[in-house]
Structure formats: structure tokens, C-alpha cells
Amino acid sequence: MLKLVILLCVIESIYSLSCPCQWNKSLRDSCRIPENCLAGTTKDVCGCCDVCAKIEGESCGGPWNIGGSCAVGLTCVKVDKRNFHSKGVCKLN
């Protein structure tokens, strides 16, 4: 019984790190269209929905790029360059 519980916990933790829209078309179809994006749009963390791209000075990056992506012509400059998953700030290339 304990082995089954552990197995289910492992499966659930793997599932929680995945993007559900990869296999669920209705989630992709339910994406909201972003409005008033100053720098255009980019895809969200899962690559499913369009979101507003970050502009110069905004926070970006983080684990799996959870903080968002910078607009074209900007780069996410990490505050802590030693930490791969650290957040950054969008700056001109």
C-alpha cells in the first residue's frame, strides 16, 4: 500500500510540472487575447497562450521563465548571474 501511495505522489509531482495545454485543446482554445500590450505579445510559460511581452525595466525570467519574456530587442538580464533560475530585468540589447 505504501508503494502505491509513493508511486501516485511521484506521478502527481511529474504531472504538476507539465503544461496541460499540450494535450488539452480546449485549454488552448480558452486563452484570452491580451489587450493593450505596449510591446506586442509572446507565448506564456507553456507556449499555449499569447501574453503581453515585458517592456524595458520590467521583471522577467525566473524558473522556467515564469516571470515572462522580454519584447523583441530586449534581453532579460539576470540580477544574480550565478543562479540559472534567478529573475531579471528587461534591458535593451
Curated annotation (Swiss-Prot):
Keywords: Disulfide bond, Secreted, Signal. Residues 1-16 form the signal peptide. Transmembrane segments: none annotated. One of its GO terms (cellular component) is extracellular region. It is found in: Secreted. SUPFAM superfamilies: Growth factor receptor domain. Expressed by the venom gland. This is Venom protein 302.
